[in-house]
Amino acid sequence: MTRPSGEIFATTRWTIVLAAGGRGTPQADVALEELCRTYWYPLYVYVRRHGHSREDAEDLTQAFFARLLEKNFLEGVSNDGGKFRAFLLVAVKRFLANEWDRANRQKRGGGVAPLSLDWQDADTRYQINPADNISPDKLYDRAWAMTVLERVITRLRDENSADGKVAVYAQCERFLMMGKDAISYGQAAAALQMSDGALRVAVHRLRRRYRELLREEISQTLSDPALADEEMQALFSALR
């Protein structure tokens, strides 16, 4: 069932983390780890674009998360911390500037790996990034935006699969994807043996649910869900 929009994101993962501050609570620890598991790839991309090898980027990313997940890391971070995306970027910049030597002195594989991450997939995805002069910051934002959209599409697929609407979703999804050559409504409706009008209604509902999930995903990374529209604009700009 679709939850109503409106007052549903007064509490987000990021507000839970910020409210705990440096004290750490089980709920905040879980919320922060979920955020890190979701958005680790943009950090890896940022470190790679800074010129680090795959192996060093893996080590640095894990070392950063080991530091981030320490109980006292968030001491002093105000409860109006804004956007997790911006916080994480500033934090990794400081980490690379101040702690690279210490991290580099650790024996490879000897440190703590706080998160189990798919490095092979990360490297494969990184290799398809354009080999241009795009800055690490811009590539980070682009990877973040793609991560958000991928999560939304995955959730849409899962919801429709659970509702037994796999075939309908497979056709409707074509009308969601940006830059993808979509078949006509008539062709898609014929493939599903439904009317053109019925398909248009299904696509309209899917787009509406897509927007709801997109806002929900974005809001989970904000201290104030009222920032969702601003963050949405920033992420779409990063994809241009």
Where are these regions (language model features)?
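Intrinsic, short, N-terminal disordered tails of RNA polymerase sigma-factor systems
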Residues: M1-R240
